[in-house]
Amino acid sequence: MALRRALPALRPCIPRFVPLSTAPASREQPAAGPAAVPGGGSATAVRPPVPAVDFGNAQEAYRSRRTWELARSLLVLRLCAWPALLARHEQLLYVSRKLLGQRLFNKLMKMTFYGHFVAGEDQESIQPLLRHYRAFGVSAILDYGVEEDLSPEEAEHKEMESCTSAAERDGSGTNKRDKQYQAHWAFGDRRNGVISARTYFYANEAKCDSHMETFLRCIEASGRVSDDGFIAIKLTALGRPQFLLQFSEVLAKWRCFFHQMAVEQGQAGLAAMDTKLEVAVLQESVAKLGIASRAEIEDWFTAETLGVSGTMDLLDWSSLIDSRTKLSKHLVVPNAQTGQLEPLLSRFTEEEELQMTRMLQRMDVLAKKATEMGVRLMVDAEQTYFQPAISRLTLEMQRKFNVEKPLIFNTYQCYLKDAYDNVTLDVELARREGWCFGAKLVRGAYLAQERARAAEIGYEDPINPTYEATNAMYHRCLDYVLEELKHNAKAKVMVASHNEDTVRFALRRMEELGLHPADHRVYFGQLLGMCDQISFPLGQAGYPVYKYVPYGPVMEVLPYLSRRALENSSLMKGTHRERQLLWLELLRRLRTGNLFHRPA
């Protein structure tokens, strides 16, 4: 039973705190006070006043940039906003390489797109840029931006091969799998319709080991240049995605069963943390479905685990999955509508079990190295058919490594309809079990792909209906987490956004809640080459801000550069403002005779 053997390796050595208690923990945890200021000394240490942040002051926003860098930024962002050029950018790159030769082509790219969006070719060559950014208050999240250059056909073949089990290939697997959690040829190339997110395709276990080594080098490099660094990882880089698909389906169906029982008990439409099932009624339903005997059911729901409330919430129900499902023998999930237990697969092969265990071991190696180097590990969100498993495995790492402070950060995609439920459930779980909550909030990178897949395959669109609804969801999630930070001195969050309104909202709520930037508990993040008018004013005002910094050889990061160009096309409103500010600063330097400005 691979899951039951492997997950304990990610559990902390300290005792778990009442994993099935339905009594909500008090929100009143130690508040963040003056003593929380790094290096602040006594509890009566006085924080410095918070400087005002002006995102419209072009002179301050770009005082770290030389004039030729401003001109390059203006050129690149203008080209990225030219639809006709973007539509043919791959052909233009190919022709340029043929006409110029490799050496001149590399120079051209370093003078333009590569120089704007990529820090350098290796960890040594990027050091001057990292030091320069730190001098102006901006830190780095390192990412080795090299991608495998696969044709669409090669990507589709790899995806279908790695997401389909041996049992499904030979016809012995069940046909009752949820189609949302099955691989489909039409969406085999996961790069389609995706911007800003790197895509990994499974080749073999050796390739996964290679990805792990790359992440380890990033951790070491980040630890050398900063005592407050981050790196981002993707779990699809660390193992066969078949496991993520199947485990996601288990978790989704387990959660769906809980909500179906909630409907039966007249609690439809309630928020996740407000739904409380009567245990006696739930026991009756479980017994009728034949999921377990009466004796087993009574063993599940005891006074010791449930306390005196007589009710069970979604966290309590989810915690049962460790011991009630057997992934490697005969995994069954209850279907309340049919009244049947549905097997997902007959069994994992020995090789599949080993591959799953290796994925978890690689995660553990990275988390231990990050802990050793004092670097925070952000686990990136991915497609919704992988995400339940990714979030659950991240949670297991948080239980083990977030004991004293948040070293492992989960990512929450706020374009999802269930984003708020996901955030509130995890915050409450951290409270109950006593570990430190760490989160990165993003809008999401897979919108077009997710919508197209849901429409084509035939399941509910998981994405919020409008851009405004996504903004509202982001602010709702952020507000909830900031409220938690007010009462919990060990929780932290990264506001990963290029939206000025969202950043202003975060700053206003921080001021209202008494969250000082010197506490280093609210971080801000943007991509290298984008929204410097947000990043540098924040950094210069003392807020902890990070640039997502890719690096790698020119030819091997071209797929990354293609996405950066396409992303700027999709963010026309934001880049228009950025181009305006760049023009203002260039004209100011021209008028004042300061074209040879030296950053200081």
Swiss-Prot record:
Pathway: Amino-acid degradation; L-proline degradation into L-glutamate; L-glutamate from L-proline: step 1/2
Coiled coil: none
Induction field: During p53/TP53-induced apoptosis.
Expressed in which tissues: Expressed in lung, skeletal muscle and brain, to a lesser extent in heart and kidney, and weakly in liver, placenta and pancreas.
Effect the entry attributes to changing R453C: In HYRPRO1; uncertain significance; probable risk factor for SCZD4; strongly reduced enzymatic activity
Statement: the UniProt record of this protein carries the keyword Cytoplasm: no
Effect on the protein of changing V427M: In HYRPRO1; benign; moderate reduction of enzymatic activity
Effect seen on changing R521Q: In HYRPRO1; likely benign; risk factor for SCZD4; decreased proline dehydrogenase activity
Any one GO BP annotation for this protein: regulation of oxidative stress-induced neuron intrinsic apoptotic signaling pathway
Annotated spans, Disordered: 155-177
Protein purpose: Converts proline to delta-1-pyrroline-5-carboxylate.
Family statement drawn from the similarity comment of this UniProt entry: Belongs to the proline oxidase family.
Disease / disorder: Hyperprolinemia 1: An inborn error of proline metabolism resulting in elevated levels of proline in the plasma and urine. The disorder is generally benign and most affected individuals are clinically asymptomatic. Some patients, however, have neurologic manifestations, including epilepsy and intellectual disability. Association with certain forms of schizophrenia have been reported.
Record protein name field: Proline dehydrogenase 1, mitochondrial
Gene transcribed to yield this protein: PRODH
